[in-house]
């Protein structure tokens, strides 16, 4: 809006990646509660609706957001004939709304209030599943993915976690980068790094790295 005003004028609707795919599959526009809760603090999870106060503060028209907010397990729509033909599936196949990736992974064993969970991938989310109101606005709180609407997930997020293995391989393990590597070469390189890391004692002999390679999210909130 501030840095690319011309592109801002061209925007008609904000959709998260999973809902964008669902739109092309069904022709229906909606958003699940977890995705809505992950959109920069503009979702009021007490009311299960967009926050008019935050939208006004940020200058975002409500019309730019999906008006239908549903649970992840709800049927968003049904497969169109065109999408069904391309995917070789039956037209009318139900398509669920889905949810944010990190919450989907918690279903492997974390679905009770009081449990903590670390989700490690490209980035890292480490948080608590609870049924309390958010007490610290520096952290992110979003609705949990079950139909039990009292459950919430509050977490701190590190932007670069698993992504650092690629940076390390490209800059310190040969200095040639990994972009030009064949897939087989990449696997061999990372396997060698994994074997070498296994020989390092716990604590890395006092070496400490602060993973602020792309700014930081909660609770630091510093883009630099």
Label for each model-derived stretch:
Residues 31-38, 60-65, 85:
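Gly-rich Lys/Arg/Thr-decorated short loops/hinges at beta-loop-alpha junctions or inter-strand turns
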Residues 37-43, 63-73, 154:
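A glycine-/small-polar-enriched, mobile loop at the entrance of the PLP active site in fold-type I
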Residues 1-30, 41-57, 75-77, 81-224:
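Active-site core segments that coordinate phosphate-bearing ligands/cofactors
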């Amino acid at each position: 809006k501030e840095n690319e005003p011309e592109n801002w004028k061209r925007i008609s609707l904000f959709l998260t990646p999973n809902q964008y795919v669902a739109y092309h599959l069904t022709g229906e526009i909606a958003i699940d509660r977890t995705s809505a809760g992950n959109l920069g603090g503009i979702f009021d999870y007490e009311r299960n609706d967009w926050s008019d106060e935050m939208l006004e503060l940020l200058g975002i028209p409500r019309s730019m957001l999906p008006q239908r907010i549903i649970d992840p397990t709800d049927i968003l729509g049904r497969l169109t004939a065109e999408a069904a033909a391309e995917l070789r599936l039956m037209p009318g196949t139900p398509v669920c709304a889905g949810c944010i990736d990190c919450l989907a992974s918690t279903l492997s064993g974390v679905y009770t209030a009081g449990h903590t969970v670390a989700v490690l991938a490209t980035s890292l989310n480490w948080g608590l599943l609870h049924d309390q109101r958010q007490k610290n606005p520096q952290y992110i709180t979003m609705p949990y993915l079950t139909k039990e609407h009292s459950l919430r997930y509050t977490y701190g997020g590190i932007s670069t976690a698993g992504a650092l293995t690629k940076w390390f391989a490209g800059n310190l393990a040969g200095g040639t980068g990994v972009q030009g590597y064949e897939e087989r070469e990449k696997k061999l390189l990372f396997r060698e790094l994994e074997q070498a890391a296994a020989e390092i004692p716990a604590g890395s002999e006092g070496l400490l790295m602060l993973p602020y390679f792309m700014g930081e999210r909660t609770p630091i909130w510093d883009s630099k």
